[in-house]
């Protein structure tokens, strides 16, 4: 029999020490990885609940196991809230991740060998948008569009020309490193012109979309998929939304289960339900507005300090800094900033001359620092400190000074107060 006072501490000290160290790192370091955020204690409470014990293959009311009456309530809540939050006719909350959500969409809409048109990973797309090393580029015939080299913006004329030439079965609109708005209406017009499905991967901007501060893809797309973390600030997981098409919805359900997954993670689905309820609040809308303001403030400082920001700025939660002009690798910049307790990720920039393991850029995002309570003033200061380090990459005194400034601001803005 288990007792409620069973703890990891004292039982598995190696693991407990690592968990404690990670909590301290999160509190003492500034997090600027665009795909990371902090979940609320409510979300973590759901994830740590007894719902993790329940197997529930199938869907609410149509399970393959008994005893699902209460987890059915949790999943029904998550589905209803997702549909309300995004104004969608259909929601599947079972995908374990964004990549598995995307995989299910491919499986539902395509046959092996069908042509897909997606954004090049080298220009800001995602592995699951047709990269050759991913299932999406191995099982399907992938054609890639990119950014205009002069403007740093998506070239919709190129997208249309490629669509007309290759006649894809599905066009993917979405990104992992693009700082501007997407024209979903134009994407849909192109898809309709060639008889393709439009699939939108809004994993990075779902929270912004929910708050009405980024264009809404749901009215334009046949299918939308997203993660539930990142800007949405929920548990790590996936979500699929779709239009009012019963046949399409059945295909999507079958592609998730039994096509790609077995039992859903009911504790994570409960956490998704919590996340969606949090996202309906006025506080969440204000948070998303601040995320965008903070990203713009940081990008402005980098530009003022002489750094090239890809696409000329940002209209969402992230931006890319090109370090080609400074002859600094993304790998070295990442390491130097990390020493100062500023966590970013090295990232390829369009037409990057260096390998993906080295890169010539940094991807910077503001969801996590905004959760801490940073506003424009703190973000401008932070961007200035980062520029100081990048301008003096080998100067330990500069790095040490910035680390002290980081420690002070983190103490003022704790993650979990």
From Swiss-Prot:
Gene3D superfamilies named in the record: Aspartate Aminotransferase, domain 1, Type I PLP-dependent aspartate aminotransferase-like (Major domain)
Catalytically driven reaction(s): (6R)-5,10-methylene-5,6,7,8-tetrahydrofolate + glycine + H2O = (6S)-5,6,7,8-tetrahydrofolate + L-serine
Pfam families: SHMT
Residues with PTM N6-(pyridoxal phosphate)lysine: 230
Compartments where located: Cytoplasm
Co-factor requirement: pyridoxal 5'-phosphate
Pathway the protein acts in: One-carbon metabolism; tetrahydrofolate interconversion; Amino-acid biosynthesis; glycine biosynthesis; glycine from L-serine: step 1/1
E.C. designation(s): 2.1.2.1
Site (Plays an important role in substrate specificity): 229
GO terms under biological process: glycine biosynthetic process from serine; tetrahydrofolate interconversion
MF (Gene Ontology): glycine hydroxymethyltransferase activity; pyridoxal phosphate binding
GO cellular component terms, A-Z: cytosol
Residues engaged in binding (6S)-5,6,7,8-tetrahydrofolate: 121, 125-127, 355-357
Coiled-coil intervals: none
Keywords on record: Amino-acid biosynthesis, Cytoplasm, One-carbon metabolism, Pyridoxal phosphate, Transferase
Top-level enzyme category: transferase
Superkingdom, natural source: Bacteria
PROSITE patterns the UniProt entry points to: SHMT (PS00096)
PANTHER family attached to this UniProt entry: SERINE HYDROXYMETHYLTRANSFERASE
Recorded family membership: Belongs to the SHMT family.
Summary of subunit composition and partner proteins: Homodimer.
Known function: Catalyzes the reversible interconversion of serine and glycine with tetrahydrofolate (THF) serving as the one-carbon carrier. This reaction serves as the major source of one-carbon groups required for the biosynthesis of purines, thymidylate, methionine, and other important biomolecules. Also exhibits THF-independent aldolase activity toward beta-hydroxyamino acids, producing glycine and aldehydes, via a retro-aldol mechanism.
Entry protein name: Serine hydroxymethyltransferase
Naturally occurring in which organism (per UniProt): Marinobacter nauticus (strain ATCC 700491 / DSM 11845 / VT8)
